[in-house]
From Swiss-Prot:
Description of how the protein assembles with itself and partners: Part of the 30S ribosomal subunit.
Disulfide linkage: none
Protein location: Plastid, Chloroplast
A Gene Ontology molecular function term of the record: structural constituent of ribosome
Assigned protein family: Belongs to the chloroplast-specific ribosomal protein cS23 family.
Protein source organism: Arabidopsis thaliana
Protein name (database record): Small ribosomal subunit protein cS23z
InterPro entries per the UniProt record, alphabetical: PSRP-3/Ycf65_sf (IPR038447), Ribosomal_PSRP3/Ycf65 (IPR006924)
Keyword Ribonucleoprotein attributed: yes
């Protein structure tokens, strides 16, 4: 039995070797087309930069050329997030604390200053000197933060430390 299997496998191999394939050059379709073809579906990407408050869901319509039915896809357009400096405050009955944090997207917040308490010390002046010591904070951002601090201190003074009084 073993010898018959050996014979049949050798005869198979010899039959393959005895065949000589002929090379013929014929016109065949190219594997890669140099022309551009129509895409199966059209997808549109929308890139915008917006403030985080203006994030909205947006409807994008794609067209499928095979059956000509429109498809709707909902995408949320997100701006590239940058690190930002934020003003934090602690509202208390007898005083108010103001401090600076840096918010880094994906990493959380990093304190940039201790809390400065009003009216114990001039918190606004201490906040201003802290901002001026950070050269990477723009003049525009510094003015915005100091104006916010002024508004918060004025609101605290008007309410007498009571958050619920109007």
């Amino acid at each position: 039995m073993m010898s018959s299997m050996a014979l049949s496998s050798t005869s198979l191999c010899s039959s393959f070797i005895s065949q000589h394939p002929k090379l013929s050059i014929t016109a065949s379709p190219p594997l890669f087309h140099t022309q551009t073809t129509k895409p199966i579906s059209v997808k549109r990407k929308i890139i915008t930069l917006a403030a985080p408050e203006t994030l909205t869901a947006e409807t994008v319509t794609g067209i499928d050329t095979s059956d000509n039915t429109p498809q709707q896809t909902i995408k949320v357009v997100k701006p590239d997030e940058k690190s930002r400096v934020v003003l934090k405050f602690v509202w208390m009955e007898k005083n108010i604390g103001l401090g600076l944090d840096q918010h880094v997207p994906g990493h959380g917040t990093i304190p940039l200053s201790p809390y400065f308490f009003w009216p114990r010390k001039d918190a606004w002046e201490e906040l201003k000197s802290t901002l001026e010591a950070k050269p990477w904070i723009s003049q525009k951002k510094m003015i915005i933060l100091l104006n916010q601090a002024t508004d918060i201190i004025n609101l605290w003074q008007q309410s007498g430390g009571n958050l619920t009084s109007q």
